[in-house]
Curated annotation (Swiss-Prot):
Pfam families: VPR. This is Protein Vpr. GO terms for biological process: DNA-templated transcription; monoatomic ion transmembrane transport; protein homooligomerization; regulation of DNA-templated transcription; symbiont entry into host cell; symbiont-mediated activation of host apoptosis; symbiont-mediated arrest of host cell cycle during G2/M transition; viral penetration into host nucleus. The lineage of its organism: Viruses, Riboviria, Pararnavirae, Artverviricota, Revtraviricetes. Homooligomer, may form homodimer. Interacts with p6-gag region of the Pr55 Gag precursor protein through a (Leu-X-X)4 motif near the C-terminus of the P6gag protein. Interacts with host UNG. May interact with host RAD23A/HHR23A. Interacts with host VPRBP/DCAF1, leading to hijack the CUL4A-RBX1-DDB1-DCAF1/VPRBP complex, mediating ubiquitination of host proteins such as TERT and ZGPAT and arrest of the cell cycle in G2 phase. The gene is vpr.
């Protein structure tokens, strides 16, 4: 006969609270990188599509994560994960060879 597993590990904060904190952090970061009218239009679209639901919260989180990741990846000045321009990737050399 199977027994229910006991709660092991530290207590976690409720999912809803964690989700709202994540959304606030993403919004704060997005405001630093994107124009407010863009973000307001995105929020309005989500509200019109999903209403005031958890599905809408999850959708805006997903969109903000994708926007920020793409923004950082293509070269945000504040990011360390941006793509280097092709002319700085080896300073014109191929396969690590140097010509002197």
């Amino acid at each position: 006969m199977e027994q229910a597993l006991e709660n092991q590990g530290p207590a976690r904060e409720p999912f809803n609270e964690w989700t709202l904190e994540l959304l606030e952090e993403l919004k704060e970061e997005a405001v630093r990188h994107f124009p407010r009218p863009w973000l307001q239009a995105c929020g309005q679209y989500i509200y019109e599509t999903y209403g005031d639901t958890w599905e809408g919260v999850m959708a805006i989180i997903r969109i903000l994560q994708q926007l920020l990741f793409t923004h950082y990846r293509i070269g945000c000045q504040h990011s360390r994960i941006g793509i280097l321009p092709s002319n700085t990737r080896g300073r014109g050399r191929r396969n690590g060879s140097s010509r002197s």
